[in-house]
Amino acid sequence: MNYSFSRVIKPIHSFLSILSGIIFSVIILSSCGKGMNKLLKNPDPAYKLRMAEQFFVKKQYTKAQQVYEDIMPYYKASKEFEDIYYKYAYCAYNLGDYMNAENLFKSYLEIFPNSTKAEEVDYMRAYSFYKQSPKPELDQTNTMRAMGMMQTFINTHPGSPRNKEATDIIDVCRAKLESKDYKSAQLYYDLGQFRAAGVAFSA
């Protein structure tokens, strides 16, 4: 009887522990959300900028991104705007939003063409395309774009210390395209389409 009772009690304890964890997480998330809303409603842009910088340093990129986006209109004509935009672009990159990051890096170069960070940002734009390169079985448009942009970077910045990595990435992308071509040819062969396979293998 005691054994049966313990078998019933243990799952209940386990369920209550999980439920407590969920409730605690909801409370924490709710309080964080309220804190962000309060910060975004704060009328002091300088305070918001300080908080955004703290979030960025702590790698809390979602929060930093929200605050940077909110204060951009206040700082658009100021000396701080370049650094804000730079970190805003990196927020997108660090959050894995590589498509948005590429667009932001591109915009940064258009807005600040003479920036001391222009070479770095130019590379990161190309690298963002590389990060969007999928496995060989899928469409390789971004792989080819990454190759082209890395080559353009090398041509534009002939003395850059990043050129070695750019060259390595081009080689990786080229190998991926070759792998895709081989797998496509192998698929034709496996399907018995030997003429198409022959053309693909010899391409």
Regions found by a protein language model. Name each.
Residues M1-C32:
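Sec-dependent bacterial lipoprotein signal peptides
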Residues F5, I28-A203:
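Acidic, polar-rich low-complexity tracts and alpha-helical solenoid repeat scaffolds
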